[in-house]
A protein has these predicted regions:
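Extended, low-polarity transmembrane helix blocks
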Residues: 1-28, 32, 46, 50, ...
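Short amphipathic alpha-helical coupling elements at transmembrane boundaries
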Residues: 32-39
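Conserved functional loop/turn residues at catalytic and ligand-binding sites
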Residues: 41, 66
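Hydrophobic, membrane-inserted alpha-helices
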Residues: 54-63
């Protein structure tokens, strides 16, 4: 096994399963997820909760098997950008800080970007099916995930005003 292809396989499995777990966690209690989304400033929170669950389960599954890899990675980048911009950036960098900093979502975003750029490797369905986004489009698709996340924040999120104000 080529070490690069083996490494990409491991990254896809770990990140894919992690993102699937996030989506399943949201999906198990959509009403609770929607209430939390509303509390942290999202408009249309019930829709956002459903979309979050579907996106995370779908993108994680696609990344896991290496199908449409740059698009799956872009969806993960978008999701982590929304998480960083709406919640984690206000709590500093480190994940162990109160409220959880942006360290974790940053790392997931960069790993997803690298996977978008390199593709899923030899052990991905993209390779088996002859799907290749190319050296130019793959990183651009990853960057489009960042733009989609920023767009999501602009359209659907406002920082909540603390109750004491």
């Amino acid at each position: 096994m080529n070490p690069i292809d083996g490494g990409l396989l491991i990254l896809r499995i770990v990140v894919g399963l992690t993102i699937i777990a996030h989506g399943v966690n949201h999906a198990r209690n959509l009403e609770g997820t929607a209430r939390w989304f509303a509390r942290v400033g999202f408009r249309m929170a019930p829709v956002q909760a459903r979309m979050s669950a579907v996106t995370e389960i779908g993108a994680g599954s696609l990344l896991l098997v290496g199908l449409l890899t740059p698009l799956a990675a872009a969806a993960i980048i978008a999701t982590m950008t929304v998480a960083a911009g709406s919640i984690h950036r206000f709590n500093g960098f480190f994940i162990f800080r109160k409220g959880e900093g942006w360290e974790y979502v940053n790392m997931l975003s960069w790993v997803a970007f690298v996977i978008a750029w390199t593709g899923g490797g030899r052990y991905a369905l993209d390779r088996t099916l002859g799907i290749n986004f190319g050296e130019v489009w793959s990183p651009l698709i990853g960057l489009a995930g960042l733009a989609a996340g920023v767009g999501q924040l602009i359209l659907f999120w406002r920082r909540p005003v603390p109750a004491s104000q």
